């Protein structure tokens, strides 16, 4: 396994560990999720470019679109929770009953 793949995989693992450790604040969780999506995007792009997958050229762009949608929804939820309760604790998400 080349060094580039190992570094990207380690970036994914560090982001995953950050998500598991810093799960009390919503902003920390969102930043760790963005790190995971960024490492997945780079891994998918490097894989497509190295293996010359012509049918999978759009896959990194589609993943980037999903990451942008996830970020927009996460930030809107962060704004709603912080305006309602004054903090960005993940525990406050249990109080949001529709």
From Swiss-Prot:
One of its GO terms (biological process) is ATP synthesis coupled electron transport. One of its GO terms (cellular component) is respiratory chain complex I. Its main location: mitochondrion. It catalyses: a ubiquinone + NADH + 5 H(+)(in) = a ubiquinol + NAD(+) + 4 H(+)(out). InterPro entries: NADH_UbQ_OxRdtase_chain4L/K, NUOK/Mnh_C1-like. It holds the Pfam family Oxidored_q2. It is a multi-pass membrane protein. The chain crosses the membrane at residues 1-21, 29-49, 61-81. Keywords: Electron transport, Membrane, Mitochondrion, Mitochondrion inner membrane, NAD, Respiratory chain, Translocase, Transmembrane, Transmembrane helix, Transport, Ubiquinone. It comes from the Eukaryota. The keyword Translocase applies. Belongs to the complex I subunit 4L family. This is NADH-ubiquinone oxidoreductase chain 4L.
